[in-house]
Amino acid sequence: MRIIATPMARILTAFLAALVPVATLAGGLDDFLAFNSGTKTATARFEQQVFDRAGKVVESASGTFAFARPGKVGWAYDKPHKQVLVGDGQKLWIHDPDLNQVTVKRMEGAMSSTPAALLAGRDDITTLFTLKDAGSADGLAWVEASPKAQDTGFERVRLGLNGKALAAMELHDQLGGRTLLRFADLKPNAVVPPQTFTFAPPTGADVIDDTPKK
């Protein structure tokens, strides 16, 4: 099973909402709101685990990511397979070097109301998600985000914060599966080169363009 093809397209899409403008909320969400409002760009490393309904790890992966608000993201898997997702705010490119294949999607359709929208989306996050304090566990304060749309492919996303720094994201899908991402070396408001969010298909790659044609 290819990592990106299943939970990652959805994760990347919940990941893009946590950096959208947020209406004022009170209580245990303060750290998340501070991170949300104060972070315009970031880079980090991540470790990803996918669990089945019985809690067994069925996939593990690692890599790096960068984002810039609004709507720009670069997500690269190093292990176990090299795969890349790049979004420039208009289009999302998914590159699988092993297959020499590039898929192009309209970013708005691919990312709205998904986990990636939690970090770099364009809209007020409260129009896409219902947010609530989810208490503390594993040394982190958790916030739960439930999508208001019905066709997102996941039930809820949990965001774990260490102070005002995002440390983890946990995606619960509608089939009882769970994907956990833990972040390291997170650098809020890092200088991210513009080319991080641009992509040109390699020569000879099979390009599948799913964007609307004018």
Give, region by region, the residue ranges found by the protein language model.
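Gly/Pro-enriched, hydrophobic low-complexity segments
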Residues: 103, 126-130, 136-211
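An acidic-aromatic
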Residues: 62-113, 179
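Short, solvent-exposed helix-to-loop capping segments enriched in aromatics
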Residues: 36, 111-126
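Bacterial N-terminal signal peptides that target proteins for export
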Residues: 2-15
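N-terminal leader/targeting segments and the immediate start of mature chains
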Residues: 19-58, 201-214
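A short, amphipathic edge element
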Residues: 27, 122-131
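Solvent-exposed strand-loop boundary residues in beta-sheet-rich modules
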Residues: 54, 98-100, 175
